[in-house]
């Protein structure tokens, strides 16, 4: 039924709409004793929040999160953690003209056909506004993974429209620079090209897609539950649940179709793997190498160029989208994708620990 939850041991359930009173999350399965404050969650929320850059939507939300349960005297209690973010900058009047029409490329038509009714204000539940709660919940997972396991999750944008970043080797990425520019890009030259492209998109009344990579380093060997809950399957599921994502690749992804077995099989030596074409996952189980995930996001359909559609009477119309929108939704997607990867990894770690905590590995890990 309703798909508002993710995870089996570490679970996240969210609710809330773009123009509702606020957003809520229940985060369950967090081990007790983790030092946690609202400031810990706010770091990633500030990276995602709208209105912080001229290259994203101009809707301004503080996205200040409140922890309403599950934390006492600065530590998690082991009970469910309740999170709340209040909406403060809705402009629902921007959407009054479209309540009887379907915006092309949006979920308006499918939500209406599925439920027989929809919240037309900013897309309601289908809006990317709901991802704020994913980021808040994911920040909890990221903190646990880093502090207890040494797992670090970081992302960077590799493409916006027809412009590409030339810095793709994770060992050479300056992560401080990535987090200091509005595009989460590792290539200083590409940042200026991205700026020029976004400015031109605004003038032309259109938008573009994007591609980004998320890397998890320090992941222990053994995470993943074959066969239906393979780690890469659950990662792909989590990434595809993000608004506008139309493609997910693990490791070399689609490029493996043009490779040969003798060069793509990630050979092993006592000193470690010789390559990482598989993206840190073999047989659906983490190998201990970096987990590399790439996602592609489509151009936002909310643009100021008129397009064909229909209204609720089934009549042909031409409509122009109004409101405040991102010319490229990929600009703010990096912390969202990081959060989703963290949620999946913590869930799988806790599942693995529950079943295999006393397993003695037959050989020493080579990573």
UniProtKB/Swiss-Prot annotation:
Gene Ontology cellular component terms for the protein in this record: cytosol
Catalysed conversion reaction: 5-O-(1-carboxyvinyl)-3-phosphoshikimate = chorismate + phosphate
EC numbers: 4.2.3.5
UniProt cross-references to Gene3D superfamilies, sorted A to Z: Chorismate synthase AroC
UniProt key word Transit peptide: no
Pfam families linked: Chorismate_synt
Residues annotated for NADP(+) binding in this entry: 48
Binding site for FMN: 125-127, 243-244, 283, 298-302, 324
SUPFAM superfamilies: Chorismate synthase, AroC
Cofactor annotation remark: Reduced FMN (FMNH(2)).
Cofactor: FMNH2
GO biological process per UniProt: amino acid biosynthetic process; aromatic amino acid family biosynthetic process; chorismate biosynthetic process
PROSITE patterns assigned to the protein according to its UniProt record, in alphabetical order: CHORISMATE_SYNTHASE_1 (PS00787), CHORISMATE_SYNTHASE_2 (PS00788), CHORISMATE_SYNTHASE_3 (PS00789)
Protein name: Chorismate synthase
Naturally occurring in which organism (per UniProt): Psychrobacter cryohalolentis (strain ATCC BAA-1226 / DSM 17306 / VKM B-2378 / K5)
Gene designation per UniProt: aroC
